[in-house]
Structure formats: C-alpha cells, structure tokens
Amino acid sequence: MSQKELWYETLHANFGQYFSVENVLFREKTEHQDLVIFENPELGRVMALDGVVQTTERDEFIYHEMMTHVPLLAHGQAKKVLIIGGGDGAMLREVSRHKNIEQITMVEIDAGVVEFCRQYLPNHSAGAYDDPRFKLVIDDGVNFVNQTTEKFDVIISDCTDPIGPGESLFTSVFYEGCARSLNEGGIFVAQNGVCFLQQDEAVNSHNKLSHYFSDVSFYQAAIPTYYGGIMTFAWATQNPALRQLDLATLQNRFAQAGLACRYYNPAIHVGSFALPQYLLDALTTIPKVIGVDSSE
C-alpha cells in the first residue's frame, strides 16, 4: 500500500481521528488562526482551523441545514438574520434560500477565512456572497452584538469550539448581547459540540443562556465529520411555543418556503429536540449560580 500523508485532528488529547491527504490546497496562518484546506478521497475538500476540522464538502449540508432551517421555519416570519462566524459561506447559502428574508448580516472575525473559502470551497457559498440582501462585517462577534443598535429575528452563532478566537462566543457577555439584539419572538441558535464528549459545553451554555432567555434547550443531528456522536445545537428564545410546533404547521411552512433539502425535513425538525437521557440528566443537575460574571 502506498504511503499517504495523514492529517491528525488535535481537538482531544487522548483520542481522535485522522484524514488521508490527497492534496493540500491551501495552508496559511491568518491574523487569528492556522487555516488549512486539503482534499480527502471520501470527504472531498476539508477545512481545519487550529488543528480542528470545521467542515467538509461531503457532509456540511447536514450541519448547515439544521442550523438554519430549524430556527427560520420555527420562527415563520423572520425578516432579518444575523450570522456570527460562518466564513465558509455555507450558512449564508442556506439562509439565502428563504426568499422572505430581507436582510442577512454576517459578522466574521477573520477576513482571511472568507477570502480563502470563496476560492477553495466555492461549493459552500454557491454564489450566496453575491446576494443583494447580504452584508459582511469584519468584526468580533461579541463586540458587534454589544455595540449594534440593530435588531434581528434570528441569530445563528456558527462558532468554532470554545478555544482560540471562538472562546468568546460561549461567554455570558456574548449571550447577553444576543438576547438584547433579538426582536420580540426572536430565536438564538449556536453549535454546542458533540455532547457525549463535550458535555460540559452544553451544561455551561445552558447555565449562562438561562439568565437571558426564558426557554433554553438543545436540538441535535448526527454529522459524521464531528467525531463522537450527535452534535448539539443550543436553542434560546423567550417563547417556548416556538420549540413545540406541531408537524402539520412545519410541513406547511416548509412547503411554502419551497425548500428542497438533503437532510432537513419537518419530521427531522420535530425529532431533533429529543435528547439522550445522559444529557437531560446533566442539564437537570446544573447548579444554580447567583449573579453572572460577564467575563465567563
């Protein structure tokens, strides 16, 4: 067997996954992080930041469809959407499929990610960067939500893991800013890691979000690239009814939106809020914290 170059993910200290590398398309240390894009025979083009896989061509649709269509169809009347992160462009691609949306703002801390992904991962954005409804802001997400006077109907935090530049997007000061930046009836969602291996992330997010939102939960999807089982997405709103929509309502909204998805459908939407018992147990034993330290 011919010797192939192997790339090892470094997210976990004692176990993990590796990828065979057919061709390194791009490698550079940007202003904020180490970025590499390479080709894998099974997963297509793969992007990693600081040693952690962020996205692959093969299965990115699962992640991006669930991060966008669940909150947008649950809301039902979203006009203004804010994406935090999302420099690869796929979240923008999925949001832009909703024709009733009037404005899409994306705040990305690293201009290099946007530039290089447009060149080396063009299928992710699929032309969405040219959508006239789209506005790109190069800024830190925490700074943006705490400085802006705009209000949004849905906020999607397409953050990395809570290390490096992404760490601030798991803090109380960020969640407070997001709550303040939502219109009445608005929804906040965020990636929250693989709950079997990163359960503390979900517990910490739940604890902090509960200070600013009356309904906090998670939904889930299995995404092969993210090693360790199902990925959880944080869900936060002031209206618990948005998490409990019946299947018929979602089917009607899905049909009206005219979406054709590869993973998402209304039944998946309803079922995604069913969580494993070990996570439910962890969330029900969260210690109550008096006061909020905005630096955490």
Swiss-Prot record:
For this protein, the record's HAMAP family field holds: Spermidine_synth
Q: Which residues form the active site?
A: 158
According to its UniProt entry, the protein's GO biological process terms are: spermidine biosynthetic process
Q: Which SUPFAM superfamilies match?
A: S-adenosyl-L-methionine-dependent methyltransferases
Residues noted as binding spermidine in the record, renumbered to the chain: 64, 88, 158-161
Q: Where is the PABS domain?
A: 5-238
Family annotation (PROSITE patterns)? PABS_1 (PS01330), PABS_2 (PS51006)
Molecular function, one GO term: spermidine synthase activity
Name by which UniProt lists this protein: Polyamine aminopropyltransferase
Q: Where in the cell is it found?
A: Cytoplasm
Any Pfam family the entry gives? Spermine_synth
Gene from which this protein is expressed: speE
- Residues at which S-methyl-5'-thioadenosine binds: 33, 108, 140-141, 165
State the oligomer form and interacting partners.
Homodimer or homotetramer.
What UniProt keywords are attached to this protein's entry?
Cytoplasm, Polyamine biosynthesis, Spermidine biosynthesis, Transferase
Which Enzyme Commission number(s) are on file for it? 2.5.1.16
Question: Hey, which pathway is this one from?
Answer: Amine and polyamine biosynthesis; spermidine biosynthesis; spermidine from putrescine: step 1/1
Q: What residue stretch is flagged as signal peptide?
A: none
CDD domains, sorted: AdoMet_MTases
Gene Ontology CC: one annotated term: cytosol
